[in-house]
Amino acid sequence: MHEKDLLLLAESFKRYYFEHFERIPVPDRAAQREFGYQRFGGGMVRHMRVKGSDELRLLLMQNSPSDVYCSNGIYSFPELPMSDKDWKEADLIFDIDAKDLGLPCRKDHTFRRCSSCGRSHSGDGCPRCGPGAHDQISVLCKDCIGGAKKEVEKLMHILEEDLGVGRDSVVVYFSGNEGFHVHIGGTQFQGLGSRERGELADYVRFVGAVPQAFGMGRNGAARRDFDYDDEGGWKGRLHREFFGPKSRSSVAITAAIKEGHRAFGERLKQISPVLGANIDPHVTTDIHRIFRLPGSLNGKSGLAKIPCINLDKFDPGSDACLIDSDEVQVTADMPMRLKLGGRRFGPYNGEAVSVPRFAAAYMVCKGLASAA
């Protein structure tokens, strides 16, 4: 990224933090959490202690970071190296990202940028430079966000029905790019280690299910072994998915018994991504991870990580677009349309345009424009 692009982003982000610091709540037990930040065009700074609002404001004003992070972990000494922090517990957080869903619309809003000349293209090779190194870029998509919302709802239903997690103890945040962070409140899960969190991640993803747990023995099964249609949890969900309503399940159960153990196991594997919540298990199991600070801007987009009060109506292109709207001159190379802040932009073919600062920041973050 060119120096003028870094300056544009640093100015835009700093202005946001100066004018809207009230949007960034200081986490509970902040002094026991590790903070960190990413510099524009620079490296990561970690192992910081922030005691309160004044120190957080100072960090943002002095450094104008591209990204700000805070640990889910609680430590005795958060400012020390990891081996000396003395971990106590950690918040339980799930990550759902639209790019991991494999939706068919993905190809329609993803393209490539040549690493040599910086031009955007949708083919296998750059029209100017030919085949070579490239970056893959995607922009906001209503269908992708909708798909991620469905996974959030699926996760929340599993947590509520199977584990007794009330909706009032769950906060869903838009990540600032293309996904959601689901924060689970309370103390029920905070003491879990990585192994236990891994088991929980497998559970909500419906990974590792075996036929015997659902009535299908290695040596066959009887009809009574599938009499769990009224049960809660995975048994009830699986029964409804495999066999349908009780009034019409007889034929499906007979067919499953005839097909046997191996076929039933294959069906379990196939149905796993349909019934389970598509979360990133590595995020859930990492008890030392630092997460994007709520209210802060995402350096990959210029959009904010904000809570979704009404998930169904939430529109990231509008609700999370919080940078100022004064006009900025950029040279844009964006081969598709983009809706942001209630306005439409593009397509652009290497042309000079005047756009609101929030759009300029988004396009520069994505590598779709350069400051004029």
From Swiss-Prot:
Catalytic subunit of DNA primase, an RNA polymerase that catalyzes the synthesis of short RNA molecules used as primers for DNA polymerase during DNA replication. The small subunit contains the primase catalytic core and has DNA synthesis activity on its own. Binding to the large subunit stabilizes and modulates the activity, increasing the rate of DNA synthesis while decreasing the length of the DNA fragments, and conferring RNA synthesis capability. The DNA polymerase activity may enable DNA primase to also catalyze primer extension after primer synthesis. May also play a role in DNA repair. GO terms for biological process: DNA replication, synthesis of primer. InterPro entries: DNA_primase_S, DNA_primase_ssu_euk/arc, DNA_primase_ssu_PriS. Its EC number is 2.7.7.-. GO terms for molecular function: DNA-directed RNA polymerase activity; metal ion binding. CDD domains: AE_Prim_S. Belongs to the eukaryotic-type primase small subunit family. GO terms for cellular component: DNA-directed RNA polymerase complex; primosome complex. Pfam families: DNA_primase_S. The keyword Transferase applies. Keywords: DNA replication, DNA-directed RNA polymerase, Magnesium, Manganese, Metal-binding, Nucleotidyltransferase, Primosome, Transcription, Transferase. It is an enzyme of class 2 (transferase). Disulfide bonds: none annotated. Its cofactor is Mg(2+); Mn(2+). It comes from Cenarchaeum symbiosum (strain A). It comes from the Archaea. The active site is at 95, 97, 280. The keyword Nucleotidyltransferase applies. This is DNA primase small subunit PriS. Heterodimer of a small subunit (PriS) and a large subunit (PriL).
